Amino acid sequence: MGDFNVALVIVAAVVSVLVLLVSVYLLINYQHPDDANQAYFPKLVVVLGITVALLSILMLPADVANRQACRRAIYSGACSLTLPMKTLWLAVYIADAVLVFLVIPFAMFYYEGDQDKSVGKRLTSALLWVAVSAVVCGLILGILYGLVGKVDFTVRHLSSAVETFPNSFTSFSTGQPCISTSPKQCAAYTAPANSQTTWTMRATFPEYVVALATIVGSVLFTIFGGVGIACLPLGLIFSFVRRPKAVITRSQYIKEATELGKKARELKKAAEALHQEEKSGKKGRKWRKNVKALGKELVLLEDDMKALEEMYPQGEQAEATWALTVLGYIGKLLFGAVGLIISIAWVAHIVIYLLIDPPLSSFLNEIFVKLDGVWGLLGTAAFAFFCFYLLIAVIAGEMMLGLKLVFITIHPMKWGGTLMNSFLFNVGLILLCSISVIQFCATAFAYYAQATAAQEIFGHTLQSLRGIKYLYKYNVFQYGFVALAILTLFYYAIFGWRKRKPTGRFQLSN
C-alpha cells in the first residue's frame, strides 16, 4: 500500500508540471499577434489561472485515487504518504477566489485602460477599481459570514436505557441472572421520527468563501453549461450541415469580398467614433452598449471572411486547401456525434441519478467502477474527461449566448487570434465555474467519489450551510441545467439548419 501512495505523490507532481506546460502552450498558440512581446503581466495571470483551473478539475480524480490508497485502512490517517486533500482543496479554491475577484479584474482593467495614458495612471486606475471591488466583496462576505455563516446538520437524537443497579445481589442465581437472558434491543433502534434535531456549528471562513464562490459559479454554470451541453455537439453537427458544398466562382468571390470590405469600413468608422467618445469621457450606458454591439459585429465579420476564404481557396495549393476544408467539416461531424453521445449521457445521468428519488440507477458511477476494474486509472481518466467536458460546454454556451443576447459581452477564443482581455475573461469564467463543476461532479458521481475530502466539503458542509442548503436540497441548479439543455435542443431543431443571413448596415444607437 505504501508503494501505491508513493506512486500517487509522484504522479501528482508530474501532472502538475505537465499542466503548467499545457497552460503555456495554450497561451502561445491562442494569443493574438498584436499581443506578442507585450502584456506580460496579463499573460502570467492567464497561465496561472489556466493552471489552477486544470489542477482543480484533476484534484477530484486525485481525491478518489487518494481514498483508494487507504481503502484497507480503518481510518484515512492510518496509511502513510497520502495527500492532504482537504488542505489542498481549500488552498486551491482560496487561490481561485483571489484570482477571480482580485487579480484577473486588475489585469483586465490595466489591459483595457486608455493606451494614451501613462503606465502609472493605468496602474492607479486599475488598483482603484480593484480596491473598490475588494472592499465591496469583503463587506458582503463579512456581513454574510457574521449573520448566516453557520452549518445546520440534521441529526437524530438517540439514547438507550440502562439496567437499574440492584441493592442486593443475594437474589441472583444461575436461573435468575443479573441481566435478563431475553433478547435485548437498543432503545435507539426504536427511536421515534420526532427524535430528529438540528446540530448547529460555525463554518470555517475558508469553507464559507468557497461556498459563496460556488453559488456564484453555479448560477453561471447552470446558464452557460446548460446551453453549452447541447450547443457544443449540435453546433459542430449543424456546422457540417451548413458547410459550403462547392467552390464559388471568381466573380462571386469579388462580389462577396466587396460587400465585406464595405462592412469593414463601416465598423472601422464606428470604432473611431466610439474611441473619440471614450477620450472625451462619455463612457455611459449607451457607449458600453455600442461597444458590445460593435464587438459582436466584428466577430460575425471575421466568421464571414473565414467562410469566404473556405469557399474560394487561393494559391498554388488551392485544391489541397479545399480538400482539408472538406476533411475539417467531416471531423466536426464526427466530434459532434461523439459529443452528442456524451451530452446525452450527462443529461440522462442527471435525470435518473439526481432528479429521481430514489435513483433509478447509479449509471455512470457503475461504468467508472467497472473501468477501474479493467485498469486502475481507466475509470479515473473517464471521470476526469466527463468533468472537463462540462468546462468546455461552459465556454461554448457563453459564446452562443454572447452572440444572441445584447447584455452579454462576447469574448471569442480563436486559435492565433485571441486578445488578452478575452483570454482573461474566459479564464476567469473557467475558474469561477470550475468550483461549481467540481461540486456538480461530486454530487452527480457521489457513489464513485464517496468518502473523499471533496464530498466532505461540497457534500456535507456546503449542502448544510444556512440559507444556501435549500438550493441543493431541491436540486434547483440541476433542474435549471436540464431545462436549458432541452430548450437549446429545441432551438437547434428549429433554427440550427438555417444559414445566418448577412446583417444590414451597422449604426451606433443614439
From Swiss-Prot:
Keyword flag Translocase: no
Alphabetical list of InterPro entries matching this protein: LMBR1-like_membr_prot
Protein species of origin: Oryza sativa subsp. japonica (Rice)
Coiled-coil zones: 252-317
Protein name per its UniProtKB record: LIMR family protein Os06g0128200
GO CC annotation terms, alphabetical: membrane
Residues spanning the membrane: 8-28, 44-64, 89-109, 128-148, 221-241, 336-356, 375-395, 427-447, 476-496
Keyword Transmembrane helix annotated: yes
Predominant cellular place of this UniProt entry's protein: membrane
Protein localization: Membrane
